[in-house]
Each structure stands twice: as C-alpha cells, then as structure tokens.
Amino acid sequence: MLMISHIHWYERLWPLGSNGTIVQSNVVNNHTYRAGTGSSLVHLINGQAGNIESHSFTGANEPVLNITAVLDQEHFGFSKLTVVNATAAKWEFIRGVDGQVGDELWMIK
C-alpha cells in the first residue's frame, strides 16, 4: 500500500484491521463506525487547513483505494471532534468556504 506522508486533502478510511483490510463488522453505516473493539482503527486525515502549496491530487491513472470512504481534494477546512458521552463521539469536517459540514462520522463504543 502506498502511503503519502504529506498531503493536502481530507480523507476518511473505512475501519482497518492490522492486516490493512476493512473490518466490515465495525461499519454500522456510511457515517457510523464501531470503535474501541480492538479489531480496527479509525483513520481520519485532514490536510485541508490550506497553504500556498494548494491541494494534493491523486494521479490520473491512480484510482481511489477501496479502503477510502470519503476523499475531498477540493475544499479547505478544519475538523471538529465532539465527545458526546462515554460511548459516542462525532467527527466533522467543516468546509472553510461556507462553514458547511463536508463529512460527518459517529464513532460508537
């Protein structure tokens, strides 16, 4: 698997196990994952704060990997984590241009 260490995009991956495969049992739906099970990790990558280098893009012949749930290579923005209680947290990607939620993920235990 190719890993890029410095990107300017927002990406949310499906819950991944130690072998790099998606742990389907931890996917409740597109916007809710089970966390804290010990079988997978939640990966949230936000390089969208913005800078003079602009965004990073996948190559024309480089498909988005099946481990990627959401990929935004267009908007700048920031992330907001809200811990609701001991068993639920909400992650939001907020677009800088209009303050709208570009992505949302609930993590439940």
Say what each PLM segment does:
Residues 100-108:
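Membrane-interface soluble catalytic domains
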Residues 28-29, 107-109:
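Short, charged/polar low-complexity linear motifs in solvent-exposed/disordered segments
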Residues 92-101:
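Short, solvent-exposed aromatic-acidic interface loops
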Residues 1-92:
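Long, structured stretches of catalytic cores involved in phosphate-ester chemistry, encompassing
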